[in-house]
Amino acid sequence: MQRRKFVEMGAVCALALTAALPARAEAERPILVAASFDAMAELVKAVGGSLVRVETLIPPGAEPHDFTPTVKTTQLLRAASVLVVNGFGMEPWAKKIAAAAENPRLMLVTASEGAVSVKNSDPDEIAEHGADDPHLWLSLSGAEIEARNIAEALAKADPKNAEAYRMQFTLFKGKLHVLKTQYSARFRNVKRRFFVPATPLLLISAGTSILSRRAWKAFSQRENPRRSGSQSLQSS
């Protein structure tokens, strides 16, 4: 599936961008944050650093929509201060498991809040996942929105360190902007402006204004590229 393919990419990017926060005093424990899957966990680490301890609900490689909560899930959420989910229909079970935890301190945060979704154009994807492409974290601007929402949630859950979370977000945002500038400069002089994305959001990361798009749905983990499609790409 597309999500499975790109969660690791998003995680690596977030880790590479993370800067260190000042460590807590030895007697002060980091707040516990539950994240729905790896990409959300890495964004939490990017703005939370040593001030947070992050636990992921969905095992690596598993699909969010196939997730079934366990007793361990409930125990984790009863102890957590924040639950971070992506949204855009990726975790339809989020509100239910948050309520089941019966933890009045638990703050449910939808990282994509305020973002405008990219619409799915593949009929199979629409039938399976809905009209919105949920892979917001793959876009540099999308990652910025999600990181900001997470930082603000952490600031509310841990007000003593609110400024530290906001400072870390500012650093993270600056590095995202540097990456965007670098990629824009590299693509500006590309003569053959042709790009095959496995998800439309990769076009946003690359810069849609300077690349032409030919999305090819055979580029996914569950499908092998068709010979006719491959020949078409080679001749482009």
What is the predicted role of each segment?
Residues 20-22:
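N-terminal signal peptide c-region/cleavage motif recognized by signal peptidases
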